[in-house]
């Protein structure tokens, strides 16, 4: 499959030692370990971009490398086979993924993958909060246990999806999009996956025409840097605090407190990824959004996005340089 998904502008490694590629992937894309073949000298290649909270990665190890991951914790992996094949093993199951097929890993899925010598993949890392937000914005119901997808899919299930990824890659490499624009693209990708691939999400529209929920969400968006009390939200929704909890559980799949915290974290991440935001320090932006305990803020951020806020800011400055 010959698709232009990230070009030399996003090149991190070429003809590189596989362990160097693996170390970089561990930092930005997903925790794993690799096992190399006994013979030969594989030469890895890697392209990488961060865009709208997503990590976009094109990778080849250049040899028959085995990749083992204990799980992604707070992120999903969409892995599209571009060249060669990849053997996937899971609880007694085996499948050789070929070009045109894709593997979707849930946060708690362990992975045991063996690349062919000519295997090349395009990987999209989606933080769970991006999919959660897509559920909320589309008025779909997220299960209490979290969103889960089936593992094996074909690109034919996602009509036009590869072209969408090409557009996103082009946007990431050639323009300095505003954070809101980047979030919009990320939301389209998440919505497309939820709509077209098998998952446990109910797409029955729950909150259509629910002015109370829409009014509360709008208030939260307009006051992310302020201390938002549950009492004020209940007053806006014209209901009791207990009914407010039920409202958020029904329409957002989480509590009001978690929803507010996640939106604050997403807004901070957008600023850290925006070169024009001129972020002077992590401490300053955390305090701006009401996170007074910096250690807890960093841990919440890492749980949501799989990296520390300092990692996000460092990567943004690296791309600008």
Curated annotation (Swiss-Prot):
The species is Pseudomonas putida (Arthrobacter siderocapsulatus)
The UniProt entry, under InterPro entries, shows: AraC-bd_2 (IPR035418), AraC_XylS_family_regulators (IPR050204), Homeodomain-like_sf (IPR009057), HTH-like (IPR037923), HTH_AraC (IPR018060), HTH_AraC-typ_CS (IPR018062)
Give the primary localization class.
cytoplasm
Keyword Cytoplasm part of the UniProt annotation: yes
Asked if the keyword Transcription regulation belongs to this entry, the reply reads yes
Annotated keywords: Activator, Aromatic hydrocarbons catabolism, Cytoplasm, DNA-binding, Plasmid, Transcription, Transcription regulation
Q: Which Gene3D superfamilies match?
A: Homeodomain-like (1.10.10.60)
Q: What does this protein do?
A: Regulatory protein of the TOL plasmid xyl operons. XylS activates the xylXYZLTEGFJQKIH operon required for the degradation of toluene, m-xylene and p-xylene.
Stored PROSITE patterns: HTH_ARAC_FAMILY_1, HTH_ARAC_FAMILY_2
Annotated Pfam families: AraC_binding_2 (PF14525), HTH_18 (PF12833)
Gene this protein is translated from: xylS1
GO terms, molecular function? DNA-binding transcription factor activity; sequence-specific DNA binding
Q: Name one GO cellular component term.
A: cytoplasm
Cellular compartments annotated? Cytoplasm
Extract the DNA-binding region annotation as residue ranges: 231-252, 282-305
Which GO BP terms sit in this record?
A: catabolic process; positive regulation of metabolic process
Ranges for domain HTH araC/xylS-type: 214-315
What's the name of the protein?
XylDLEGF operon transcriptional activator 1
């Amino acid at each position: 499959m010959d698709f232009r998904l990230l070009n030399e502008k996003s090149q991190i490694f070429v003809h590189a030692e596989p362990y160097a590629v693996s170390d970089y992937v561990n930092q930005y894309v997903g925790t794993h370990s690799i096992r190399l073949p006994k013979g030969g000298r594989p030469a890895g290649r890697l392209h990488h971009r961060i865009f709208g909270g997503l990590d976009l990665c094109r990778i080849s190890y250049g040899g028959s490398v085995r990749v083992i991951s204990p799980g992604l914790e707070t992120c999903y992996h969409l892995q599209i086979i571009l060249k060669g094949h990849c053997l996937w093993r899971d609880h007694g199951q085996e499948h050789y993924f070929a070009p045109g097929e894709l593997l979707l890993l849930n946060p708690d899925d362990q992975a045991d993958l063996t690349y062919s010598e000519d295997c090349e993949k395009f990987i999209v890392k989606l933080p769970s909060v991006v999919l959660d937000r897509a559920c909320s914005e589309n008025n779909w119901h997220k299960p209490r246990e979290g969103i889960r997808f089936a593992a094996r899919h074909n690109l034919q299930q996602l009509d036009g999806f590869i072209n969408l990824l090409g557009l996103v890659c082009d946007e990431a490499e050639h323009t300095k999009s505003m954070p809101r624009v980047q979030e919009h693209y990320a939301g389209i990708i998440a919505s497309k996956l939820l709509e077209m691939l098998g998952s446990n999400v109910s797409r029955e529209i729950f909150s259509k025409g629910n002015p109370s929920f829409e009014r509360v969400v709008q208030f939260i968006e307009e006051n992310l840097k302020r201390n938002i009390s549950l009492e004020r939200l209940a007053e806006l929704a014209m209901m009791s605090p207990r009914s407010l909890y039920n409202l958020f559980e029904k329409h957002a799949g989480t509590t009001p407190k978690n929803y507010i915290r996640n939106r604050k974290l997403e807004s901070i991440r957008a600023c850290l990824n925006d070169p024009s935001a001129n972020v002077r320090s992590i401490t300053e932006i955390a305090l701006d959004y009401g996170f007074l305990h910096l250690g807890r803020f960093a841990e919440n951020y890492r749980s949501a996005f799989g990296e520390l806020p300092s990692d996000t800011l460092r990567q943004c400055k690296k791309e600008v340089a």
